[in-house]
Amino acid sequence: MRQDKPGVLLVNLGTPDAPTTSAVKRYLKQFLSDKRVVDAPRWLWWPLLNFGILPIRSPRVSKLYASVWMDEGSPLMVYSQRQRNALAARLDMPVALGMSYGNPSLKSAIDSLMAEGVTRLIVLPLYPQFSCSTVAAVWDGITQVFAGYRSLPSVHFIRDYAQHPAYIAALKASVERSFAQHGKPDLLVTSFHGIPQRFADEGDDYPQRCYETFEALKASLGLGDDEAMLTFQSRFGREPWLMPYTDKTMESLPGKGVKHVQIMSPGFASDCLETLEEIDGENREIFLHAGGTRFEYIPALNDDEAHITMMLELVNQYR
């Protein structure tokens, strides 16, 4: 009789191995080559990526990574490893960390779990809100790895957790800590990573999941419609993305009398370039330059105890 041995695979997007041009170029090439991320025809996208985008963006992006790099490494990697370690300490089963792009790869993570005899795999993509460009890419990556296996484990794939009570409670606690430390702002802004509007039009329910998180958090905090808003960040390319845009919102708020904002990015399980540099750096500068007076960034949940407890609850559903 086959022994039942569960194991957990935590997955996040990924990060360059170092804040150098060569490492960033290698990472961006893998990331931007995924059709889930950029679905342009390959004959058009390949030369544009390799002869235009990568040579131009890699040196600039490497400097941005260097500005947020921690002593232990990339913030996303540091916090993801801490999450894995904390979860493993509270579970009596193997826990591995894999990245969709870069290292540790999904293959290395899955191989390590299979080598430990795992027969039932619990996959937790660390994306609270489903999107075809993130969670579906994890699904693709896992199936590609298992294409090389003769035997497969049972797989429990956690699609997302946008409204999970423990997730909302963890977000609420982080906002309340910020309010207690800095005072209640004129406006709480929740900034989610954007996707092309076309993806949503074609069936990706990501925007709905973001709004469901936002509404649940707003209700838990007892905030009115004029005290919190949702925006979308990190647009790339020329086609329309989900709106309102975070940077344009930060530019316009002071003119509407909003002088004090606190901003968080609930869609990021770990702080990374998009939160530390884009939100706490670029958007802070935009808001203050436009006439704002106070801007506070509320960190991602990272390895906060409430975040680990949430992960534990999600995993325990499938033990």
UniProtKB/Swiss-Prot annotation:
InterPro entries in alphabetical order: Ferrochelatase, Ferrochelatase_AS, Ferrochelatase_C, Ferrochelatase_N
Taxonomic lineage: Bacteria, Pseudomonadati, Pseudomonadota, Gammaproteobacteria, Enterobacterales
Enzyme class: lyase
Keywords carried by this UniProt record: Cytoplasm, Heme biosynthesis, Iron, Lyase, Metal-binding, Porphyrin biosynthesis
The protein's role, per its UniProt record: Catalyzes the ferrous insertion into protoporphyrin IX.
Pfam families in the cross-refs: Ferrochelatase (PF00762)
Source organism: Erwinia tasmaniensis (strain DSM 17950 / CFBP 7177 / CIP 109463 / NCPPB 4357 / Et1/99)
An annotated Gene Ontology molecular function: metal ion binding
Positions that bind Fe cation: 193, 274
Similarity remark: Belongs to the ferrochelatase family.
Gene3D superfamilies linked: 3.40.50.1400
Pathway field: Porphyrin-containing compound metabolism; protoheme biosynthesis; protoheme from protoporphyrin-IX: step 1/1
SUPFAM superfamilies: Chelatase (SSF53800)
Subcellular location: Cytoplasm
Reaction equation(s) it catalyzes: heme b + 2 H(+) = protoporphyrin IX + Fe(2+)
Gene Ontology biological process terms in this record: heme biosynthetic process
Highest taxon above the source species: Bacteria
Protein's name according to its UniProt entry: Ferrochelatase
